[in-house]
Amino acid sequence: MAGFGLPNFGQLTEAFKKAKQIQQDAQKLQDELENMEIEGESDDEMVKVWISGNQLPLRVEVQENILNSDKEKIEQNILQAIQKAHELSTTTMKERMNDLTGGLNLNLPGFDNTDS
């Protein structure tokens, strides 16, 4: 600490540099997630959905022969595909955020920032 209880100017400058780098990396990550397409598929592979890394629905693909199934079967397949895509998207987002914030111990809710 320098005089008057203020931090050393060099330390302050370094902290600002790190903050700016984190901000730039966070924007880059946001762009990557936005452009990412994550696929989820029903157990019987009759329905596929794609969502972005930000969990924005992008498209749905349904196999022709599922249209002969009953309403409940179609709904179940759609739900399975959405849930799988969402789970993969969430996992991907957490991993990328962890890579970005690793070692900073930011204690962000929902993100494990420890190396356990």
UniProtKB/Swiss-Prot annotation:
Pfam families: YbaB_DNA_bd. It is found in: Cytoplasm, Nucleoid. Keywords: Cytoplasm, DNA-binding. The keyword DNA-binding applies. SUPFAM superfamilies: YbaB-like. Its main location: cytoplasm. Homodimer. This is Nucleoid-associated protein PMT9312_0020.
